[in-house]
Amino acid sequence: MPLKLALPRSTTPKDPARCTLDIRMESPPLVFLGSPETSSGALASGILKLTILHQPFIKVHTLKLQLIKRITVLHPAISHCSACAGSKEVLQTWDLAANTTYRPGTQHWPFSWLFPGSLPASVSNRYIKLEYYLEATLCYGTPEGGISPSKPEVLKFPLQLKRAAIPSPDTIHKRIFPPTNLVANITLPSTLHPHGAALMEVTMTGFAQNDGNDWKINRVTWRLEEHMQFSCQPCERHRDLVKPRPIEEKRILSTQDLQSGWKFIDNQMFLSTQINTSSLREPSCDVEIPAPFSLKVSHHLIFETIVNRKKNVAGNNMGNARILRVSVVQPLTTPAGLGISWDEECPPVFESVGPAPPAYT
């Protein structure tokens, strides 16, 4: 077999970088505390850096920083229409420099902006993607290029916005199952977190009946479901051609089937089990996006138990059976950390400080 010799290839050296852009965030993670109606927002602050390399100077014609909110529909009604495929909204613009000459070194521009608490959190699934990012655009000229504007340098810095519930005590859900005397009390945390664990406690009473017939538990099942509702409306130009098709999807994130593990004390059933959310694959936290790209993600905990009626008569201790089902809304959000919003961390301003105490004489 003849050998193949590799021929040398001519390579064109790349032009050395004349300048670089960089963004350093100084604020903590962007987390909305509370519902969109009550949240005070999230404060973002950082520094934009411009480093000039291998040039005696550069002439900056424009340096602009924008905060952008972008919605992308992965399966739009009209695939070739950009308006049906999403939207782009500029939330804030900073004009940092214009017609200015800079020598070699690093220049800094601080920036800050308060995200309103009514904005939806970042989300990404197989139907829609909502993202926030910073985009810096630099248009400059170099001495060798006659200080005419060259190809703009663009830096895209993604931001992750999350929403968390304010820490609160556990919630007790009470359900009555007529015509029986059975009553269930389910104690759950106020919110669940992805990749974590939570304790669920169940207490049931009313197993002893007045007619001498008792109820007996055979099986207990619980599952955590994710409900998603999505509807994409076409743009104004295609609204009469295509009708929106709402999509509803349910999937089970975690489940457990128990045939033992509970105990009876004085005709009361006690069950304590753990809801493990660490095995959830790409869970979506609760989020709601308004029209025209409507998305609502919620989570529900379903608790089911099968009870049999047994008669206190010799030779016949099995009777009819019932399935008792409890469905409660169980929020799934990002952990709140210390649960302190940005406005509570700020020191008091001069107007909010009261008068000094009287001096001693």
Swiss-Prot record:
It is found in: Cytoplasm; Nucleus. InterPro entries: Arrestin-like_C, LDB19_N. Gene3D superfamilies: 2.60.40.640. It comes from the Eukaryota. The modification Phosphothreonine is found at residue 12. GO terms for biological process: clathrin-dependent endocytosis; ubiquitin-dependent endocytosis. Keywords: Cytoplasm, Nucleus, Phosphoprotein. The keyword Nucleus applies. Its main location: cytoplasm. GO terms for molecular function: cargo adaptor activity; protein-macromolecule adaptor activity; ubiquitin protein ligase binding. This is Uncharacterized protein C18H10.20c. It comes from Schizosaccharomyces pombe (strain 972 / ATCC 24843) (Fission yeast).
